[in-house]
Amino acid sequence: MKRHLDGFSIVTENMKVNVSMNRVNHNLDRAQLWLDSQIMTDMVPLMPQNTGSFISVTRAQSAALAGSGVIVAGAGPTGRFLYEGKVMVDPETGSPWARKGAKKVVTDRPLTYSNPNARPEWFEVTKKKHKKEWVKCVQKRIEGK
């Protein structure tokens, strides 16, 4: 468990009260773990799904970080261009198939995804759609419900 909040004591002439924040810290950890996992689940329908390996690798990388507040929206090496939704080409040849050692550049041509529901910047699209639901569910978990 992470220590988000430290416990503290209140001392008066007649009394001393120790306040433990363990339950609050536990609830915060639980809420963060839920949110990280839920974001990944909600993103999947909008992600490119040609063979499924891109999503599998992205899920595995996100799962390894679950509870940290870090989400992997698109695992490399293809994640960047898939997420941006633009064709990338070898600057010298103009071909999507790059020469060995060539650094691809982004074009203004949109990618065509095999998944009809896939969208560029799928995390942003997902956040816009689910943010209110996420906030409500996180709040419940923080409250211990």
Task: Annotate each PLM feature.
Residues 1-79, 91-145:
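Short, Lys/Arg-rich flexible segments
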Residues 80-86:
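His/Glu-rich zincin catalytic helix
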